[in-house]
Amino acid sequence: MADADDVRRLARALPDVTEIDSAGFDFRVRNKGFVWSYPERTPGRPRVIRTDVAVLYVGDEAEKQALLLGEPELFFTAPGYDGWPLVMLRLARVDADRLAELVTDAWRMRAG
């Protein structure tokens, strides 16, 4: 099972990646975010940076829905992400190989 350190290791190994200083992790390529910590928002409370959940760029709404419907134990979304090609990934439930695939795919789509 993965954690924030695994995300950092994978993202830092990719070409042309910039790490943004944050309370969690935040990685970009060509000024476009591809993986970052989930900023959980609860009405009436301060935002909480969740390093146990990664926000991943997935390219389009079709891919987002496929991931959400196909693997609900791994992926979820929140109302603030409606209309955005982003999913949240529960790091504790994903294995290292799948995490590497997801981070690399997100990077590739944003770098291209």
Q: Could you tell me what each predicted segment is?
A:
Residues 1-112:
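Charge-dense, helix-prone N-terminal extensions
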